[in-house]
Amino acid sequence: AYKGAIIPHLVAQELMSLNTRKSVKPIFWVREKNQSSAEVDLVVQFNKMVIPVEIKSGKEGKLKSLHQFIEAAPHPYAVRMYSGKFSIEEHKTKTDKKYFLMNMPYYLSTKLYDYLDYFVSNFK
């Protein structure tokens, strides 16, 4: 019952623990529109990009909000933290914008920036 709230909290805590010099609060993205809204669980700064991170409590889950973020982003990178295996997939949004999705198991959350370095360097 609490899985949907606990997992994002734990992942955010793991990422916050990486910043030992200053207190960093987790940042999320919200798009509010009259008839619909969208929310991405976390956004992280990597190089000069803001990368969306969706945190799912299981192996499955829709990525509708992530697609809306990617539509507005000047880069093709997104991350999903979930209970599955590591993989990188190529996807398209509804408007056919191509992007790359890096799927990471929760236990790798403290290695996010190392994996982002590999991800951004090798997928263009």
Language-model segments: residues:
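A cross-kingdom feature that marks ATP-driven nucleic-acid transaction machinery
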Residues: 1-124
